C-alpha cells in the first residue's frame, strides 16, 4: 500500500480544508515547497498536489509554486485541481509532473479525457472522482453532477483510463476514519486500480484499507492526519527535527 502525502495549495500557501469547505482553511506552511521537502525527508515515494484556486476558477494560479516543488524533488508528483484543457495538461507534463488528475472535466467534458489518452499514456492521465453519497461533485466540490460515481468510472474505463483517485467527501478532513464501505462498494463496481483518499486518520485505518487490496485499492492519499502527526513513526522523525533540514539532500530516503 503506497502512502502518498497530500499538499493542497491556496493563495500560494500549504493548507488543509475540512470536507472541501474553503471557509474551514488551516494554513500549515507559507511555502508549499518546504512542506514537500519535509515529506520527502520522511521517505515519501510520491506526492499529491492540488491547486485549490484552480479547482474553483480553472486558472493555473499556483503553477509556479508547483513547478518549484517538481524541480526540487526526485520522486514522482501528481497534480490535480482545475485541469480542464489539453493545454493545462501539457504545461504540467512539460515541467516534469508525472501524473495529471482530471476531475471536473471528466464529468463536464469527457471527450477531453479521450483526446488526452490519444496523446499520453494511462499512467500519465488519471481521473479523480470526489463523491458524496455516491454522487461526484465538481468545480471545487461546489456543484453536484447527475451521474453515479461507479458509472462515471466505467465510462472512463471504457475510454482507457486505468486508475481512479476516489475521495469520499463526507470523510475528507474530518479525522473520523475513512469510508470503508463506500470505498469498497466503488472499487468492487469499478474493477480498476484505485487510489483511496479522504478520512484516513490513523494506523488502524491503514490496516482496514489494506483489506481492500484484492479489490484494486493499492495506494492512499493522506492529508490532515499526516499534518497532525497521527502516526507513531512520525514521532521518530520529529525527535530528530533538527536533522530534517530544508536542503535538497535526500540521502535519508530512496526513490521507489
From Swiss-Prot:
A Pfam family matched in the record: His_biosynth
Entries under InterPro entries matching the protein? Aldolase_TIM (IPR013785), His_biosynth (IPR006062), HisA_bact_arch (IPR006063), Isoase_HisA-like (IPR044524), Isoase_HisA-like_bact (IPR023016), RibuloseP-bd_barrel (IPR011060)
GO term, biological process aspect, one? L-histidine biosynthetic process
What pathway does the annotation place this protein in? Amino-acid biosynthesis; L-histidine biosynthesis; L-histidine from 5-phospho-alpha-D-ribose 1-diphosphate: step 4/9
- Compartments (UniProt record): Cytoplasm
Q: Name one GO molecular function term.
A: 1-(5-phosphoribosyl)-5-[(5-phosphoribosylamino)methylideneamino]imidazole-4-carboxamide isomerase activity
Q: Which UniProt keywords apply?
A: Amino-acid biosynthesis, Cytoplasm, Histidine biosynthesis, Isomerase
E.C. no: 5.3.1.16
Q: Which residues does the entry assign to the active site, renumbered to this chain?
A: 8, 130
Q: Which reaction does it catalyse?
A: 1-(5-phospho-beta-D-ribosyl)-5-[(5-phospho-beta-D-ribosylamino)methylideneamino]imidazole-4-carboxamide = 5-[(5-phospho-1-deoxy-D-ribulos-1-ylimino)methylamino]-1-(5-phospho-beta-D-ribosyl)imidazole-4-carboxamide
Top-rank lineage group of the source organism: Bacteria
- What Gene Ontology cellular component terms go with this record? cytoplasm
> Quick one: where is this thing mainly located?
cytoplasm
Region forming the signal peptide: none
Of which family is this protein a member?
A: Belongs to the HisA/HisF family.
Instruction: Supply the name of the protein.
Output: 1-(5-phosphoribosyl)-5-[(5-phosphoribosylamino)methylideneamino] imidazole-4-carboxamide isomerase
Amino acid at each position: 500500500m503506497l502512502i502518498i502525502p497530500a499538499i493542497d495549495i491556496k493563495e500560494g500557501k500549504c493548507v488543509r480544508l475540512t470536507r472541501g469547505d474553503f471557509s474551514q482553511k488551516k494554513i500549515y506552511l507559507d511555502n508549499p515547497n518546504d512542506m514537500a521537502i519535509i515529506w520527502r525527508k520522511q521517505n515519501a515515494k510520491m506526492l499529491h498536489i492540488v491547486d485549490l484556486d484552480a479547482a474553483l476558477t480553472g486558472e493555473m494560479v499556483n503553477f509556479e509554486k508547483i513547478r518549484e516543488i517538481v524541480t526540487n524533488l526526485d520522486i514522482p508528483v501528481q497534480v490535480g485541481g482545475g485541469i480542464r484543457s489539453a493545454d493545462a495538461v501539457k504545461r504540467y507534463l512539460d515541467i516534469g509532473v508525472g501524473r495529471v488528475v482530471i476531475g471536473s472535466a471528466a464529468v463536464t467534458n469527457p471527450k477531453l479525457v479521450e483526446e488526452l489518452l490519444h496523446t499520453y499514456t494511462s499512467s500519465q492521465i488519471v481521473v479523480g472522482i470526489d463523491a458524496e453519497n455516491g454522487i461526484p461533485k465538481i468545480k471545487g466540490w461546489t456543484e453536484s453532477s447527475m451521474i453515479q460515481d461507479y458509472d462515471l468510472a466505467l465510462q472512463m474505463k471504457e475510454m482507457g483510463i486505468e486508475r481512479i483517485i476516489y475521495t469520499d467527501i463526507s470523510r475528507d478532513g474530518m479525522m473520523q476514519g475513512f469510508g470503508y464501505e463506500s470505498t469498497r462498494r466503488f472499487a468492487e463496481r469499478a474493477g480498476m486500480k484505485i487510489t483511496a483518499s479522504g478520512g484516513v486518520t490513523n494506523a488502524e485505518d491503514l490496516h482496514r484499507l489494506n483489506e481492500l487490496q484484492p479489490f484494486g485499492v493499492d495506494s492512499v492519499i493522506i492529508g490532515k492526519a499526516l499534518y497532525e502527526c497521527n502516526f507513531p513513526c512520525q514521532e521518530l522523525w520529529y525527535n530528530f527535527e533538527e536533522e530534517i533540514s530544508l536542503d535538497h539532500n535526500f540521502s535519508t530516503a530512496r526513490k521507489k
